[in-house]
């Protein structure tokens, strides 16, 4: 397992948004019982055996994927950044396969309330949520906010992590 020198994903400090790679509304393999799984983008490791390698780095905006998307779900904005239109995406992963950096451009910057709104749609059918990645503990403030919302709704919470966060520095996260 190699530790990266630089973490490429960073939360937007102004509004608390983090890069969300995907939300799986119903999962029976990401923890006990039926749950919603939330995958965040960015990791501080570069493991060869990574289960979700496309979640390690943020898109570098090289644009290699834009013309290759069969559904036109990717475009370059006026600032030269690759943008993603989830409504058009068919989930074929062409963008990931053609990326020279193995990144996924299919992220949405979301705050805890927006993610929980997606989770809440599944509440009658799930027992909890699992947040994974990438490395979800790169975003401890986001996790705390999301878990407060989930616990308040009676849902269990799990973190799927590489274990590098010093939880003693985040007692409020452990208290949730």
List where the protein language model places each region:
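N-terminal [4Fe-4S]-dependent radical SAM core
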Residues: 1-82, 101, 121-125
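Conserved Radical SAM active-site core
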Residues: 58-174
């Amino acid at each position: 397992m190699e530790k990266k020198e630089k973490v490429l994903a960073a939360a937007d400090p102004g509004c608390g948004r983090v890069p969300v790679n995907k939300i799986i509304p119903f999962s029976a393999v990401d923890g006990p019982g039926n749950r919603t799984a939330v995958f965040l983008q960015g990791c501080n490791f570069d493991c060869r055996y990574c289960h979700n390698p496309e979640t390690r780095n943020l898109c570098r905006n090289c644009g290699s994927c834009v013309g290759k998307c069969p559904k036109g779900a990717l475009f370059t904005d006026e600032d030269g950044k690759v943008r993603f239109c989830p409504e058009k995406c068919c989930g074929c992963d062409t963008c990931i396969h053609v990326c020279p950096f193995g990144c996924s451009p299919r992220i949405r910057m979301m705050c805890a309330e927006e993610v929980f709104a997606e989770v809440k749609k599944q509440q009658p059918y799930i027992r909890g949520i699992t947040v994974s990645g990438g490395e979800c503990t790169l975003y401890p403030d986001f996790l705390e906010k999301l878990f407060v919302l989930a616990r308040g709704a009676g849902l269990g919470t799990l973190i799927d992590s590489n274990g590098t966060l010093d939880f003693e520095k985040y007692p409020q996260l452990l208290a949730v």
